[in-house]
Amino acid sequence: MLSLWAIGLLGLLNQVEALWSPSSYQSPAQQRSAQFSSSGWGTSPAAQNPWSFNRPMPNTNMPNMNTGSLPGSMPGAMPGSMPGAMPGSMPGAMPGSMPGSMPGSMPNAMPGAMPGGTGSGFMAGAMPGAMPNMRSSNNMMGNMRNGYPPSYMTPSPRNTICVAPVSQPRLCMVNGENTHKYRLKDVIEFLGHPNIEKVPKCVPGVPRVNCADYYAAQYIWKRGYCYCKNFHSNLPSYQMGSTQIRCVLNNCGACSQEFYVDKQRVVKCE
């Protein structure tokens, strides 16, 4: 009697277990065995070494791995970035630097260069070999390159400095008494060099070139050492400080032009 009651109790327990347990239940060991066999993990003839990459790795479908990244990239990395690099940076570059540049420098610039510069140590917009807003000394031979001195600004109502010869007119503001006359020899002596064409500097103290001396006037005109080009006596006066200086161009017939400034004040031509 007791045995029949025990058998009935076991049957009831089996029915309850069948109701609460799904028919497709598998133990963790059974799940891993079935997963590896379906992926081909156990079919390789090589030794079953989990660190041997001569066989395909099992598809474990781990969450949050390689989400949105390229194949082979690290988890959470930007597409195409190297492991350990900042997002979007190039391999081997400093964080935040541009490709091909020195660490911390601007793109396409030499180390220490300012943006827009052309090389190391140059300010923005400066040309190679010249510093911005720098004027040479009385003799500009030291700054000449390929026979041409650096170009300076042309005269304007508020800027009455000398400009480089050859390409731009040069204005020397000198004593305007208009009484002295100089020959070519005198002009050369003022320049301080026998070859007037190779000394690009002004002639301080030369108020007027003698129009009768054709060659002197032509040298002054062509080489631009001390002259006013395309100015006439009716033009407005130039302003330099509190002194108005007007450049006068006179036509002296068949020989050439004469040039002077009609103020009785010597202004240094730099």
Swiss-Prot record:
Residues 31-95 are annotated as: Disordered. Disulfide bonds: none annotated. It is found in: Secreted. Component of the acid-soluble organic matrix of calcified layers of the shell (at protein level). Residues 31-52 have a biased composition (Polar residues). One of its GO terms (cellular component) is extracellular region. The keyword 4Fe-4S does not apply. Residues 1-18 form the signal peptide. Residues 56-95 have a biased composition (Low complexity). Keywords: Secreted, Signal. This is Methionine-rich protein. It comes from Lottia gigantea (Giant owl limpet).
